[in-house]
């Protein structure tokens, strides 16, 4: 009879969990392999380029993005020096993007950008490349390398193609991306603050104030600086942060908290928000 040691149970569970996590990836790989075999059977060598390209475009219109990407790649492979190949490289990137295969999309777009830097669609290629990173932004508790790449690529679109519709949309996404990066700094700062590592917390909160001034996290960052400096007994710096908070965000709940925390009658009292004033008129 087989006897399982209690000491081996956690390790066994880890193996089971790992196997379960790998199941979706294995299923996805199997489906891709089936699709590739099916496509290989229907693709003829030296098929007329127009037919091959139109077939790829039809799959794209039908939402069969994996097939579309592979067929566009086939156009590029069979007719590498044609005008069809130039368009197919870009469309392959788009099809991979729609299929959420962002690494493959970036590879296809990099090829297009390298080979055709003067193409009329080059701004769109850079914009689509930026979106490949933007769509992968995850919550602030995870590594933000992808967020940084999104910001870098979106900024490139704005800098290189400022008068395009892509630049205008990129600017909106830059604001959201910067807000996300500021959120990550706040998450780390709170972590340090909760563990009484006040100098480390101050560094994070100050970075939000200095580098992400237009984000929604600045009022809280200033209040957390007040908390951190008071915890270290540096009241003058706490008052300075509170003064900046009160000047820029006098109606903020964070200024109210800082005002109460400092108990400094020389500081301007927090202003009532428009919401509070409206309620006061309604019920008084």
Question: Where are the regions a protein language model picked out?
Answer:
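Sec-dependent bacterial lipoprotein signal peptides
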Residues: 1-28
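Acidic, polar-rich low-complexity tracts and alpha-helical solenoid repeat scaffolds
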Residues: 2-7, 28-284
């Amino acid at each position: 009879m087989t006897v399982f040691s209690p000491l081996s149970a956690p390790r066994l569970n880890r193996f089971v969990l790992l196997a379960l996590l790998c199941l979706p990836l294995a299923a996805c790989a199997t489906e891709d392999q089936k699709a590739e075999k099916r496509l290989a059977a229907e693709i003829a060598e030296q098929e007329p380029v127009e037919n091959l390209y139109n077939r790829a475009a039809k799959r794209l219109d039908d939402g069969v993005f994996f097939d579309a990407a592979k067929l566009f790649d086939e156009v590029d492979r069979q007719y590498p020096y044609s005008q069809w190949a130039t368009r197919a490289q870009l469309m392959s990137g788009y099809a991979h993007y729609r299929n959420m295969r962002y690494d493959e999309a970036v590879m296809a777009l990099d090829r297009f950008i390298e080979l055709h830097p003067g193409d009329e669609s080059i701004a769109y290629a850079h914009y689509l490349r930026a979106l490949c990173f933007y769509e992968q932004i995850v919550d602030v508790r995870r590594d933000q390398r992808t967020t940084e790449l999104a910001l870098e690529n979106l900024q490139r679109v704005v800098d290189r193609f400022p008068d395009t519709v892509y630049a205008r949309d990129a600017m909106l996404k830059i604001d959201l991306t910067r807000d996300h990066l500021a959120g990550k700094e706040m998450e780390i700062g709170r972590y340090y603050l909760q563990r009484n590592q006040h100098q480390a917390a101050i560094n994070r909160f100050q970075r939000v104030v200095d580098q992400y001034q237009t984000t929604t996290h600045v009022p809280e960052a200033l209040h957390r600086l007040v908390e951190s400096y008071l915890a270290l007994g540096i009241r003058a710096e706490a008052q300075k942060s509170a003064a900046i908070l009160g000047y820029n965000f006098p109606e903020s709940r964070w200024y109210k908290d800082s005002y109460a925390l400092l108990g400094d009658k020389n500081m301007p009292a927090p202003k009532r928000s428009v919401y509070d004033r409206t309620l006061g008129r309604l019920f008084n």
